[in-house]
Amino acid sequence: MATPAARSPFLEPSSTTAGVPRTPFPVPPGPSDITYVDGADRPPSGRLVLIGRDGGEGPNFGLRESLDIGRIEGVVILADDRYVSPRHARIVARRGSYHLRDLDSTNGVFLRIPFLRGNADPSISRKPLDPEQELGGQELFLLGQQVLRFEIVKNAEEGLGVASENGTLLFGTPATPRFARISQRTVEGVIRDVFHVRKAETVIGRESGDIVFSDDPFVSRRHAVIRVLPTQGGSGRRFTLADLSSSNGTFLQIREEVQLRHGDHIRIGQQLLRFDLDTTSPGA
């Protein structure tokens, strides 16, 4: 069965603490406030396209030196989405390219990671993230309706060892190592289920895999994979996340400013946006 292309809510709506006024982010300078020298650093023209629930293109917004996205403040106003913070994210032009920044939003900004195998859109020639994205712990990532947090377990959590009573070993299911855990976050702001990464490859999907979300129609049959790999020198472990050519993609929360590339998909609240550049303009 084909995976429907749609979006869904994921975290608790942004709110303002009662009685405490929210301090707005400073409004960035407009296009007339920035001067380019001989056009050397001028970025190509382009647009930010809002993708509808049916997968079709909605309103689009021309790129500028600084473009803010929010529920109340900014150039791109997503007024009907309560999962979007008042001023949520910013796209800024710098040294001939565009960069995406989270403005301390409640629910974060997520960027679609590349496919592990192939590329569905041949026009996307470059990517800001590697096909296998390194995970360092505490990352949030999205697939389908699922909001998942990845955490590396501490040494004390990896295994308790063999238990005994009065010198006799206790009978039980053989223990397996725990390298990391994946927590499922709900709209109530609490953790529902916790899954453990126990082997070299942990596949997440709707019908097959090690972690299965069978009731989520927006998750592909085999959607994403987390790999446990040796570090350089083999003395430790590292973890990667990759998308398995899913229909709706896997989105990783950005932790710092990220350079955008033509064709990138951005998740903000319930909204999906596509970053398009005019590849025929100077600087593209």
Predicted regions and their residues:
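Extended helix-rich, non-globular scaffold segments
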Residues: 272-273
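Intrinsically disordered, low-complexity acidic Ser/Thr-rich regulatory segments
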Residues: 1-81, 125-127, 132-215, 280-284
